[in-house]
């Protein structure tokens, strides 16, 4: 295994807040597993559109509400600016 591939598979160095865990666990407890995955990806700092089809992601956003703590963290993450713009546009509709 080379050094490059090792660095690629390292776990993210992120802290998950209590409110974020509660939102993820609540989604799991009511059977919204796809939404829990979206919340987990946002919390870890990943862009869900990398892993979830666009139409599925938009449907999940329309049917669920993103907790404020995850919204704030997502907006601070540089790679998630496009997603934030999409959410703002959906809120205006």
Curated annotation (Swiss-Prot):
Delays heterocyst differentiation and commitment when nitrogen is limiting. Interplay between the 4 HetP paralogs controls the timing of commitment to heterocyst formation and its duration. Epistatic analysis show that the 3 paralogs act upstream of hetP to delay commitment (asl1930, alr3234) or inhibit development (alr2902). Asl1930 and Alr3234 must also attenuate the activity of Alr2902. Ectopic expression partially complements a hetP deletion. Induction: Transcription is up-regulated by 6 hours after nitrogen stepdown and continues to rise for at least 24 hours. In bacterial two-hybrid assays interacts robustly with Alr3234 and weakly with itself, HetP, Alr2902 and HetR. In Nostoc filaments, approximately every 10th vegetative cell terminally differentiates into a heterocyst specialized for nitrogen fixation under nitrogen deficiency. InterPro entries: HetP-like. Belongs to the HetP family. GO terms for biological process: heterocyst development. Disruption phenotype: Single deletion, no change in heterocyst differentiation, in a double hetP-asl1930 deletion no heterocysts appear before 48 hours, by 120 hours only 3% heterocysts form. A triple asl1930-alr2902-alr3234 deletion makes 50% more heterocysts than wild-type (although they are not active for N(2) fixation), while a quadruple hetP-asl1930-alr2902-alr3234 deletion has delayed development but makes wild-type levels of N(2)-fixing heterocysts by 72 hours. Keywords: Heterocyst. The N-terminus (residues 1-68) complements a hetP deletion for heterocyst formation but only partially restores nitrogenase activity; it does not bypass the requirement for heterocyst differentiation master regulator hetR. This is HetP-like commitment protein Asl1930.
């Amino acid at each position: 295994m080379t050094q490059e591939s090792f660095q690629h598979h390292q776990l993210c160095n992120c802290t998950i807040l209590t409110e974020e865990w509660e939102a993820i666990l609540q989604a799991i407890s009511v059977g919204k597993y796809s939404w829990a995955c979206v919340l987990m990806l946002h919390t870890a700092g990943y862009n869900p559109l990398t892993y979830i089809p666009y139409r599925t992601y938009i449907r999940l956003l329309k049917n669920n509400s993103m907790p404020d703590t995850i919204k704030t963290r997502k907006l601070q993450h540089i790679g998630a600016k496009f997603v934030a713009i999409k959410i703002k546009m959906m809120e205006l509709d």
